[in-house]
Design a protein with these regions (language model features):
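Conserved N-terminal segment of class I S-adenosyl-L-methionine
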Residues: 3-146
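Short, conserved loop/helix-junction motifs that constitute active-site signature segments
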Residues: 107, 173-177
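Short C-terminal domain-edge/linker segments immediately following a structured domain
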Residues: 124-128, 169-171, 184
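A conserved beta-strand element that flanks and buttresses the S-adenosyl-L-methionine
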Residues: 155
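Hydrophobic adenine-recognition pocket in adenosine-nucleotide-binding enzymes
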Residues: 159
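A short, conserved alpha-helix within the catalytic core of class I
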Residues: 162-174
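Conserved beta-strand signature within the Rossmann-like core of class I S-adenosyl-L-methionine
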Residues: 177-184
Length: 184
């Protein structure tokens, strides 16, 4: 609490240019620190430290982008409407970067099968132990350098902003195996 008060006070008296320079420095330092680490190491640390916040009773929380209704609601409405328009046998969904499954859980009723994929092994172990639905399964995989599961529809939601352009290119090169791909 005291640290927060000090930060607010410093922001109030520091020149705006100094604040921008500080934020550029922090981003560069974080990028440099993460450039020699695997995505598994980076994202495992994010969950372990609660960088995206903490959920109600869950040990894993993917942040407000996955839990805020005004953000998630329109996405779930659009994807579920699309899934309902398909024959049931064509609703095999692969969710790359499934995170804490808070969004995927809302789409599950419209899927003939759902495979959630994430690079964090502990998250995948947790989901496989906690989610007991016959159509849901979770797989640990590196979507950049690893194999992707088979399916009809691929969802990539709020993943690419965390990857470099080269990493995004590697993922995009693998997506032709899916009939439909939604990238948001």
């Amino acid at each position: 609490m005291v640290l927060g008060q000090i930060k607010r006070w410093a922001k109030g008296i520091a020149p705006k240019g100094a604040i921008r320079a500080y934020h550029r420095y922090r981003r560069a330092a974080e990028h440099s620190r993460n450039s020699n680490r695997t995505p598994q190491e980076v994202f495992s640390e994010i969950y372990r430290k609660g960088v995206w916040g903490t959920g109600k009773a869950e040990p894993f929380y993917s942040g407000t982008g996955s839990s805020t209704e005004s953000i998630v609601g329109p996405y779930v409405a659009a994807i579920s409407e699309y899934l309902r328009s398909l024959p049931e046998e064509s609703r095999r969904v692969v969710d790359l970067g499934c995170g804490d499954f808070s969004v995927g859980r809302q789409l599950l009723p419209y899927c003939s099968s759902y495979i959630g994929v994430d690079v964090v092994p502990a998250l995948i172990e947790h989901l496989n132990s906690q989610v007991s639905h016959p159509q849901a399964h979770f797989v640990h995989a590196d979507i950049i350098d690893g194999q992707l599961p088979d399916g009809d529809i691929c969802l990539i939601r709020q993943v690419f902003q965390h990857l470099s352009n080269a990493q995004i290119g590697k993922v995009l090169a693998k997506l032709d195996r899916y009939r439909t791909v939604f990238i948001t």
